[in-house]
Amino acid sequence: MSGKAIFVVIIAIVLLLLIGSLIGFYFYERRRRQNAPVSPVSPVTPVQPGPPVSPTTCPAYYTIDSSDISGFNMSTINNLATQDDCSQECSKNPNCSWYNYDPNNKVCYLKKTVATPNTTTTFRIRNTGNYDKCTQWAPSINGDIPGFDIKDINNNTEDECKQECIQYDCDWYNYNSDSKACYIKKTQKQNGIVTSFRTGSNS
């Protein structure tokens, strides 16, 4: 065999060895990947809740238009330009439970309940919209507003009195804890006058 033929044979053998090595490496890697453990899935980080939304500011007063609770005046203030001015005057006096305001004559009537032991006057606060989380009842302890009754109920709990108040579309009720007497109340209709109950909120 000539030297050239021997060289060709050697080259062919080398190529076969390289091809064989590549094929062997391919199958080795394939088998290794098939047997490799599956990496665990990283846990999903839960979304952290944001800070709680601050509640809507509750109103300090609840107003009923075209209504009056006559009498019970503790102070009459003239020349108050706006209802807000009247609200501020009521807020200055801890005994002021509600007020009537006459916007035409700019007169503010600050009101207080009649001191009566074991009797609570509770104003109904009809909140709507953004104020649905605010208080719906504003009690005035040991105080009464005689008159304005639309229904009287005996031998009831105060919770039952409250439900009767809602049923009869009341504006407030008086409840005597000794006699268990419940008096459902409503303002008088009076055009041009507003009645505004103090809710107990500080806004």
Curated annotation (Swiss-Prot):
Q: Does the keyword ATP-binding apply?
A: no
Instruction: Keywords in alphabetical order, please.
Output: Disulfide bond, Glycoprotein, Repeat, Signal
Q: Which residues form the PAN domain?
A: 58-128, 134-203
SS bond list: C86-C108, C90-C96, C161-C182
Q: Which Gene3D superfamilies match?
A: Hepatocyte Growth Factor (3.50.4.10)
Glycosylation site list? N73, N95, N118, N155
Domain of life, per lineage: Viruses
Show which residues constitute the signal peptide: 1-24
Q: What is this protein called?
A: Putative PAN domain-containing protein L775
